[in-house]
Amino acid sequence: MLCGEYAVTIGVEALALPVGPGQWMHVWEFDSPGGGDRLIWEAKEKNGNSWLNESFSLPLEALEKADEKNNSDRDRDRKVLHLMLSLVSEGFWKPGKSYRIETQLEFDRSSGLGSSSTMVANFARFAGLDAQKVQQQVFGGSGYDVAVAELGKGLVFWKNGEVANWDKWSLSSDLTAQWKIVFLGQKQNSRNALSDVKSKLEGMKNDDFLMHQLQQVCAAVKLANQGPMLEAGLEMWQAILAMSLGLETPYQQFKFQPVKGGLCKWLGAWGGDMLLINDVFAESEQKALKKFHMVSWNDIVVNQRSF
């Protein structure tokens, strides 16, 4: 998400673009051997190593949402997977048949590029389910990332109550030629990040002036046709949100110094996933940034337009 984080859950528009690396899913159906019908799910890292390997008896029973704060990572992942699998329509899993489902990431799982959202989009497509409903029942959140994974193009995303809406949107690659994404290696949990500021978001929702201000800034970013205008809008969005939610900007967290013409903005949940920076900022904080992995925005973000 380029702009709109957190506030998208209370009705403010958000702007998001897909990245090139994704996640694929293969499904094999075969006659069950002795011992009953089974479903085996194996999820693989970018390097091919398995990070999740679970086996379930069929048919599945519904499972309540996992409490991520009170479960081990493995227990949580198993419960989340079981819950998603249980959402299929009655009779979807054929009697006398077993299944093997294998997923493969094309990016590092710790990068925050969408391992969960691409999994939901892939499985919903396979099972004939509404991906937004699957997302809400399993993970919660706004669902913008699932919409991006489904559409495969940039979009403007907003919610009317619980209903997700989106339109196509693109951003000129000329405007982003000097942008870089900094991977911080501290993947954030979006559900927990939203939970931490839930009460403040509710207060923002009831502040008409603030909501109008956020919508206007997001609209300015959406329509920007000059680099300085676009970057100023992103910096303004971050400053308003930091003040409203009591969160630290990357300048505060990393003790970075603002520089004229520089851009440094959180991408994803604040505090660890990624930073968006431009060349001006990269030059001014070269020493501090050298320990992080960086890629050019235009090398990883897809479906942009060129003037």
Give the ranges of each region predicted by the language model.
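ATP-binding N-lobe of GHMP and related small-molecule kinases
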Residues: 1-111, 133, 263-271, 280-286, ...
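Conserved hydrophobic/aromatic beta-strand scaffold that supports enzyme active sites
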Residues: 16, 24, 146, 156, ...
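FAD-binding core of FAD-dependent oxidoreductases
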Residues: 7-12, 16-18, 117-118, 142-153, ...
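Acyltransferase
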Residues: 169-223
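Glycine-rich, charge-dense phosphate/pyrophosphate-binding loop(s)
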Residues: 3-5, 9-11, 216-307
